[in-house]
């Protein structure tokens, strides 16, 4: 079905080459609850609108980034 306002916002935020981490997405979607941002992001990955890539950060921690397909 049609994307929700939150889904459309997540996809547009993830439109850059680098993608976005969940923390940044939550910060940019402050009108929405964190759990809703997490749920909608997971749904978008399942639909294929986003892909999740795990990137090793400079501190050796791996971070998941979401990138619009």
What name fits each language-model region?
Residues 55-69:
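Short, cationic-aromatic polyanion-contact patches
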Residues 1, 39, 56:
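Phosphate-binding/switch region of NTP-binding enzymes
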Residues 45-56:
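A short, conserved structural fragment
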Residues 1-11:
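Short alpha-helical segments that sit at the start of domains
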Residues 31-46:
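Short amphipathic alpha-helical interaction segments
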């Amino acid at each position: 079905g049609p994307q929700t306002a939150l889904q459309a916002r997540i996809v547009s935020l993830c439109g850059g080459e680098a993608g976005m981490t969940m923390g940044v997405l939550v910060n940019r979607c402050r009108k929405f609850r964190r759990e809703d941002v997490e749920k909608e992001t997971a749904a978008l990955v399942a639909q294929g609108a986003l892909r999740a890539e795990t990137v090793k950060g400079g501190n050796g921690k791996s971070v998941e980034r979401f990138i619009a397909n």
